[in-house]
Amino acid sequence: MFKHLNLSKKVLAAGLASLVLASSATFAQTKSVAVTAIVEHPSLNAVKDGVYEVLQEAGYKEGENLRWQFQSAQGNTSTAAQIARKFVGDQPDVIIAISTPSAQSVLANTKTIPVIFSAVTDPVAAKLTQSWDGSGTNVTGVSDMLELDKQVDLILRIVPNAKTIGMVYNPAEANSVAVVKSMEAELAKRGMKLLTAAAPRSVDVSTAGRSLAGKVDVFYTNTDNNVVAAYEAMAKVAQDSQTPLIASDPPSVSRGAVAALGVDYTELGRQAGRIAIRIMEGEKPGDIPVQTGEKMSLHVNPSAAEKQGITLSEELIKEATEVIK
């Protein structure tokens, strides 16, 4: 009898030991990914979704071996700073910061936790990194920088006689400041000029747009987060003033822009997700060069064009990756 009891105890002990080891292994394999964005709008949401897709495809399952958390700053930089401090306190394996303001907030609070930015136009101008070739620090990421000559080419295909381009932007957003400077230089090469109006908050977008109405031949929007968050207001200004609105991010075409040639933001997120996996598997963020969007797409909206007083050419519509109807 005692032999049987001793044997049972040994079996039970072995079973418990196996359970503890299995639990420890699961815990050790669990990775924590914290994601933040300055605001929620279609382009930034697509980045977030792309990150999540890639992690799932790689076998990182939320609730099993992945701790996933997402927080939006709802357009408030003070909230972005609070989220950054909270995430740093959580000590995740990786923080993914979507947009320049979110990335700046996170990097102001940690020099050790790996940080991956996405939907950032010029990370050097935004002082996130000193080099596109590898920061040597705790940051890397994926830029949505576009070749502005191709953006101007698109503008002129849609409005051939355009001379003055209008841009509404947030002067506190480094991305937008960089685009404004580059766009001014690109337009000057072609004998064109840029007029701008400031929208420090999303609620200022409509007023800023109306201040340009009648003075510009085309409205052009970059991925300024205040403008994109209030894109329907910008589209209404374009419609009311009969001024074509051309975007740099394809998701804005379904919200009222007549066309956009830009990066695929879901793919931009997938690129960031693949970088996150590399880091979680042991690579250092500072050794990974900054990437740019790998996939471009042209979206057009003939209905929006008609409402804004123009007709898109059949040739352009045929070239489009997606036609919004």
Give residue ranges: language-model regions.
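N-terminal signal peptide c-region/cleavage motif recognized by signal peptidases
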Residues: 23-25
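Short hydrophobic alpha-helices and adjacent helix-cap/hinge residues
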Residues: 2-16, 27-325
